[in-house]
Structures are given as structure tokens and as C-alpha cells.
Amino acid sequence: MIMLILAPLVGVLGALLLAYGAWLIYPPAGFVVAGALCLFWSWLVARYLDRTQSSVGGGK
């Protein structure tokens, strides 16, 4: 149960630290990294939802 809560939190914290680290090197890079991570997350969620919807539908 704790892993279900801890895994997304660690992922979000990692994304924030990655974007912050890029921002410390070059401020616009932080926004680029954060935007790329958001796009990647959106793609993963859409892919996951597509796979779960096609397998739940009956036999036809």
C-alpha cells in the first residue's frame, strides 16, 4: 500500500529536481525540461489508458 503512494511521489520529486537542476545551469532550460517531462507523462498516461480500454470491452 505504501508503495502505491510512494512511487508517484518519488517520480514527481525526481521530475522537479531534474527541472530545477537544469534551471540552475541555464534558467530557460528548466522550463524546457519541465515541458518535456509533462509531454512525456501525458504520452505515457494516454498510452496506458488506450491499452486498458481496449482490453476491457467484452469478447467482440
UniProtKB/Swiss-Prot annotation:
Membrane association type: Multi-pass membrane protein
CC per GO annotation: plasma membrane
Residue intervals passing through the bilayer: 5-25, 26-46
Locations listed in the record: Cell membrane
Superkingdom of origin organism: Bacteria
Keyword annotations of the record: Cell membrane, Membrane, Transmembrane, Transmembrane helix
Main localization, broad class: membrane
Name of protein: Uncharacterized protein YmfR
